[in-house]
């Protein structure tokens, strides 16, 4: 059976990164380097920023450096209660420009000029802001202690009044995880990560219901999974050993289980495992030696295992993870 529903075109203009609020009543989007909120019931548009300008100010969408180096474009996020929107602002006014010829349908090429910092040149100046929808007011997060830095990740936690941000120095060997009060915009460092070479920025940060969080780190010489409380105190190391966690698949809160891929059965092999958040009851979900990779269903009950080896072409199998049986 199916239900037929009507699709409604909301805008007669192009928008970037339209994102529903958690309560489904609003849509945040970017247009012309500014941020807006569309209320579905009233069809009203509320403008969050007004200073957006090409090759000068970008609000809520990343610049070239962030898109290429940190692999994300949408630089805004809804709070869990749909009352606030946090966003990153990029001031690229002082960034050097690069021009290139664009060969379109015309007889002659046109010139496109955009901001492009090369090594050693000025990056965009970034700042973090929290917009309160009911008050139509914005607060800037004080990051004055940092100099020439990146806001490599930004997301609200499960607590609707706590925003997280990962601030990375330009050398990329020192990262602070910040928790920011949604009302005052006051920030505190809850975790620091240093590395002699560089700190790898990932999307592995996972918040639990009590706002404790899962974090991956190479601090013991190997990439492993850790559990911290909501204040950034280490509760326990989930995985350990002289091997690498090569992919973190996620956490199932119902079964209190973490899923990951690692090199536990040999550095040239990849196997898929589940483990309790306590670090106990580890199980191998893949049973063939070679390269295994998993894609899990949203509830982690099923997964597609992709397997290959020197003697086996890529093979896909649908499996039960057995965690809810």
Regions found by a protein language model. Give the residues of each.
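A short loop-to-beta-strand structural motif that recurs across blades of beta-propeller domains
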Residues: 34-36, 127-129, 176-178, 224-226, ...
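Short loop/turn segments that connect beta-strands within beta-propeller blades
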Residues: 40-43, 133-136, 182-183, 229-231, ...
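Asp-box/WD-like beta-propeller blade repeats and closely related beta-sheet repeat scaffolds
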Residues: 4-26, 33-34, 44-73
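Conserved small/polar residues in nucleotide/adenosyl-binding loops
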Residues: 1-5, 323-325
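Beta-strand C-termini and the immediately following turn/loop, strongest in propeller blades
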Residues: 27-34, 39, 74-77, 86-92, ...
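Non-catalytic accessory segments flanking enzyme active sites
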Residues: 13-16, 86-90, 95-98, 125-127, ...
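Predominantly five- to eight-bladed beta-propeller fold
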Residues: 48-76, 84-140, 322
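Beta-propeller fold detector
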Residues: 6-8, 45-53, 139-142, 187-192, ...
């Amino acid at each position: 059976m199916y239900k037929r529903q009507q699709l409604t075109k909301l805008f007669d203009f192009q928008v970037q990164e339209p994102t529903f609020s958690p309560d489904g009543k609003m849509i945040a989007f970017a247009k012309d380097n500014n941020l807006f909120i569309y209320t579905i019931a009233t069809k009203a548009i509320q403008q969050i920023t007004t200073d957006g300008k090409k090759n000068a100010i970008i609000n809520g969408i990343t610049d070239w450096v962030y898109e290429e180096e940190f692999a994300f474009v949408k630089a805004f996020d809804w709070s869990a209660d749909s009352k606030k929107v946090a966003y990153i602002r990029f001031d690229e006014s002082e960034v050097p420009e690069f021009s290139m010829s664009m060969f379109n349908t015309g007889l002659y090429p046109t010139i496109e000029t955009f901001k492009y910092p090369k090594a050693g040149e000025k990056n965009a100046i970034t700042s973090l802001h929290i917009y309160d929808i009911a008050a139509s007011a914005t607060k800037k997060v004080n990051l004055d202690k940092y100099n020439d830095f990146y806001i490599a990740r930004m997301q609200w936690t499960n607590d609707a009044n706590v925003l997280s941000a990962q601030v990375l120095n330009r050398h990329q060997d020192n990262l602070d995880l910040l928790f920011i009060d949604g009302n005052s915009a006051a920030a505190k460092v809850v975790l620091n990560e240093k590395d002699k070479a560089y700190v790898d920025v990932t999307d592995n940060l996972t918040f639990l219901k009590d706002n404790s969080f899962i974090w991956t780190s190479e601090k013991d010489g190997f990439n492993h999974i850790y559990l911290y409380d909501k204040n950034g105190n280490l509760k326990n190391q989930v995985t350990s050993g002289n091997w690498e966690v090569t992919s973190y698949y996620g956490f199932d809160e119902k079964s209190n289980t973490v899923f990951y891929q690692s090199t536990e059965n040999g550095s040239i092999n990849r196997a898929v495992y589940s483990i309790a958040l306590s670090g106990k009851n580890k199980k191998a979900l893949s049973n063939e030696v070679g390269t295994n990779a998993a894609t899990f269903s949203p509830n982690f009950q099923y997964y597609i295992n992709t397997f290959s080896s020197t003697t086996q072409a890529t093979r896909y199998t649908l499996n039960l993870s057995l965690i809810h049986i």
